[in-house]
């Protein structure tokens, strides 16, 4: 830039600079280009600064005129840049909206819905059937003590179930319950007969994991205490429940042994051509009633228990209990 420009020439150069800047700002396509133009025209080493370097040869009266004109130009260019950035921002947003526009006439792709876990639905179905028979739901703690889990149920100290290899002991007298029967004892401590309860819950045993065993599984146990109850009431209740759950599968009772019931039986259903054990049951041992202060001469009762996993596997034709715990959506989406 010549250092001998007159006032008139400087004003002319400012007008040319204004026209050039306005044209280039208007044609800019993105914010990066705008920033380059800002530095080119308004930066410390930009065209406006270089042009104003010619003011040194002007008179004291002329310099304020050029300075004022340069400030007006700078403000105008800053406004043009600001307006252009807003335009570019609006255009970018419009492009995004166009790309994200939903075609309301397009057919739906469907929404993936969650499903209740088959163990939960099986438990609820079992409970609903017993609620229909007049039973009430009763629940208890999963951390139990020796008395409720063993002693009150007539399980002697030398019984195999108390062995460290079968029970998770937590220290002292506490353990993870091996069945939901302790719920029945707690209930009978607070309620007087007649009592009819169903007790669902998670239980724990030191079982190796395989196709039919798990160290954590679910049980539902049933207890009825009333006057003049006998084995025919037990058998009728179990038969009604199993037929309602499984349909017309053949059912049989086999004599068995449980410490807290006498007589005791195991219940099988015929499934895929074979007999499959699904329940244990029996008449409540009078010793258990006496321990709870219930007169066994006046009251009698029966108890029955089942594994929810076994019922779920039979209901859905599963051959491996581990499928119920893997959280594999490909498997769970079937239910």
Curated annotation (Swiss-Prot):
Lyase found in the keyword field: no
CDD domains: PheRS_alpha_core (cd00496)
A GO cellular component annotation in the UniProt record: cytoplasm
One MF annotation (Gene Ontology) recorded for this entry: tRNA binding
Enzyme Commission code(s) on record: 6.1.1.20
Top-level taxon in the UniProt lineage: Bacteria
Co-factor note (free text): Binds 2 magnesium ions per tetramer.
Top-level EC class as recorded in UniProt: ligase
Cofactor(s), names only, from the UniProt record: Mg(2+)
InterPro entries: aa-tRNA-synth_II, aa-tRNA-synth_II/BPL/LPL, Phe-tRNA-synth_IIc_asu, Phe-tRNA_ligase_II_N, Phe_tRNA_ligase_alpha1_bac, Phenylalanyl-tRNA_Synthase, tRNA-bd_arm
Record GO biological process: phenylalanyl-tRNA aminoacylation
Signal sequence, start to end: none
Binding site for Mg(2+): 262
Cellular localisation: Cytoplasm
Catalysis: reaction(s): tRNA(Phe) + L-phenylalanine + ATP = L-phenylalanyl-tRNA(Phe) + AMP + diphosphate + H(+)
Quaternary context: Tetramer of two alpha and two beta subunits.
Family stated for the protein in its record: Belongs to the class-II aminoacyl-tRNA synthetase family. Phe-tRNA synthetase alpha subunit type 1 subfamily.
Record NCBIfam families: pheS
PANTHER family: PHENYLALANINE--TRNA LIGASE, MITOCHONDRIAL, PHENYLALANYL-TRNA SYNTHETASE
Protein name: Phenylalanine--tRNA ligase alpha subunit
Organism per entry: Prochlorococcus marinus (strain NATL2A)
